[in-house]
A protein has these predicted regions:
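Conserved catalytic-core segment of clan PA serine endopeptidases
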Residues: 3-8, 26, 59-130, 137-139
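Beta-rich catalytic cores
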Residues: 30-31, 118, 212
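C-terminal subregion of chymotrypsin/trypsin-like serine protease catalytic domains
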Residues: 43, 51, 217-265
Length: 265
């Protein structure tokens, strides 16, 4: 049912690869999902995913001077400094985020967050070297009982990061294979947000870790929403997403280019 829709989604679904380095040198790979919106390289995802870039900057600003301070000290002084700042083996020291297949050199990023929904736009600094692709089309119509497909990235089985001296992470590009993971579901209910507006909807199946920010597409491959996360109702795991009507309003407010299918069905 969704074979053609998934092929379409391959044109605009992009992974965000993240490396998490802890004080005990444990390195964890993570994946998130974004949607390429236009030829400027603007991306749509959740606010939580976009916040990883702020986390990267904050950790660097906090720990770089501390690591420099303990670099050439005795073990006794090092222990005192670590205790002073509350640093343990499980303390997260460094995060490195890499946008995949967006531009030759994306540069710095700017984040535009929705006022209260888990929705954000990522804008790259260098827009002239973006990789060209077929852009998505948003469709505002949806129905309870409609079959949909969530097309994102999960199960981060890759090796993209390497630790250098003093807890620096670099991208190795050693293994950069990011297969998509589609999940089919059915729209079950509309959801009111905290402002008492219907901006979201519920789906009959849950998503896997890493799929937050993935597009929810209909059988034609048109985006009818963006998946935000899961919720548990008894023993059952359901997912929910923000609808295209709300997304389009957000894009218009911020003068972001996008394509839309008019409701002619």
């Amino acid at each position: 049912m969704f074979k053609k829709a998934i092929k379409k989604a391959l044109n605009f679904v992009r992974p965000l690869a993240s490396g998490y380095l802890y004080y005990d040198h444990k390195l964890i790979n993570s994946l998130s999902t974004t949607i390429l919106l236009n030829e400027d390289g603007d991306l749509l995802t959740t606010k939580k995913v976009a916040s990883l870039f702020a986390m990267q900057d904050e950790l660097r600003d906090v720990f770089k001077p501390i690591l420099t301070e303990i670099q050439n000290t005795s073990e006794r002084k090092k222990t005192k400094i670590l205790k002073k700042y509350g640093i343990e083996n499980t303390t997260l020291i460094t995060v490195l985020n890499i946008l995949i297949d967006i531009a030759e050199n994306p540069g710095k990023v700017k984040i535009i967050s929705h006022k209260y929904l888990d929705l954000a736009i990522i804008q790259i600094e260098n827009k002239e070297n973006t990789f060209k692709s077929q852009m998505p089309k948003f469709y505002q119509s949806k129905e309870i009982g409609e079959s949909v497909c969530i097309v994102g990235f999960a199960f981060p089985e890759y090796k993209a990061f390497k630790e250098q001296a003093n807890y620096e992470l670099i991208a190795t590009n050693e293994i950069m294979n990011f297969p998509i993971f589609p999940i089919s579901a059915m729209i079950t209910r509309n959801i009111y947000d905290d402002q008492n507006h219907i901006t979201m909807f519920e789906m009959s199946d849950g998503i896997e870790l890493g799929m937050q920010g993935a597009p929810i597409v209909n059988t034609k491959g048109e985006i009818i929403g963006l998946v935000v996360g899961n919720k548990n109702i008894g023993p059952r795991k359901l997912s929910y997403g923000i609808d295209s009507k709300t997304i389009i309003e957000f894009l218009k407010e911020n003068n972001i280019k996008y394509e839309e299918v008019k409701n002619e069905k």
